[in-house]
Amino acid sequence: MTLAHSLSFPDSLRDGPTVGDLGEFEVIRVITEQAGSSLNGDDAAVLRHASPNSRAVVTTDMLVAGRHFQLDWSTPEQIGQKAIVQNFADIEAMGARPVAALLAISAPTHTPVEFVRGLARGMNQRLEEYSAELVGGDITSGDSLVIAVTAIGQLGGSLPELTLGRARPGQTLVAHGKIGYSAAGLALLQHFGPDNVPEHLRPLVDAHCAPVLTPGRGMVARAAGATAMTDNSDGLIVDLNQMAMKSGVRIDVDSSSISPDELLSEAASVLGTDAWRWILSGGEDHTLLSTTFGDAPSGFRTIGQVTKTRHEDLVTVDKKTPAFSDGWRSF
């Protein structure tokens, strides 16, 4: 058995041709049918700037089957939604507006065309929320199933981009979105499998398989005077550590502002674990984390303060060493 054929797709996707049966151009046609664009079809896409002083913001991220998603846990649509959100969150974290995406797929020849169709459909669902388009990409055969998305955003106006190194003492730490939900959903899937998760805990699983990001929050924060921003992809403490290190500051998180809600507490009770691990080190929520002077921007809530107080940790919780500080590792 080859490595490629060790990748197993759900039975529900197998009724029909494979990508090997159709070939490259027919598979591309399947994708564009689900996520069409007037800019897609030439050797490259030409994007117009929204205004003369607009700047381009570009990022890329990959999802690897068995590493970032499980085919028996997530539908193709959910995988497509996740691929867009994790990239667009990086664009939002710069204070920019996502406008386009490119999709590159490396897939075994036995990959069902129905998987690719569902993937593109899920991507388009998230793209439409942003009025963005899939403007091109590439597909090739390979032993592993790898999905790579390049996201393109536009940064208008004269305000600076929201980099990691612009947090200053005296500023407020704010957040938009749930924290700990994705990690809790993953833990539930690992324990129960995809079909036996208690129904009232399904929102946590959904947060892991198909995260949601409210469009435009990064732009709102930038317009309101935000300085530094990132998204919670690798774990709250890990991501805030990067911000603190690059800004040369300390960040103290207020535990009462991020304490486990009823859903997280119930999941932790069911699994016999500590919900704080999910909150502090879980990641993949793609919650926007920002620093700002004054009140939290619309849609954000205050969760801490930026200080210059000496402490052995760059990031503290209630001015103490965090109980959990590990996070996602790529290697």
From Swiss-Prot:
Positions with a binding annotation for substrate: 68, 284, 328
Residues that hold Mg(2+) 4 according to the record: 43, 59, 90
Binding site for Mg(2+) 2: 61, 90
Residues annotated for Mg(2+) 5 binding in this entry: 234
List of residues binding ATP: 137-138, 233
UniProt key word Signal: no
Reaction(s) the record says it catalyses: thiamine phosphate + ATP = thiamine diphosphate + ADP
Single GO biological process annotation from the record: thiamine biosynthetic process
One annotated GO molecular function: thiamine-phosphate kinase activity
Cross-referenced CDD domains: ThiL
E.C. code: 2.7.4.16
Pathway info: Cofactor biosynthesis; thiamine diphosphate biosynthesis; thiamine diphosphate from thiamine phosphate: step 1/1
Role summary: Catalyzes the ATP-dependent phosphorylation of thiamine-monophosphate (TMP) to form thiamine-pyrophosphate (TPP), the active form of vitamin B1.
NCBIfam families: PRK05731.1-4 (NF004351), thiL (TIGR01379)
Family indicated by similarity: Belongs to the thiamine-monophosphate kinase family.
Name recorded for this polypeptide: Thiamine-monophosphate kinase
Organism this protein belongs to: Corynebacterium glutamicum (strain ATCC 13032 / DSM 20300 / JCM 1318 / BCRC 11384 / CCUG 27702 / LMG 3730 / NBRC 12168 / NCIMB 10025 / NRRL B-2784 / 534)
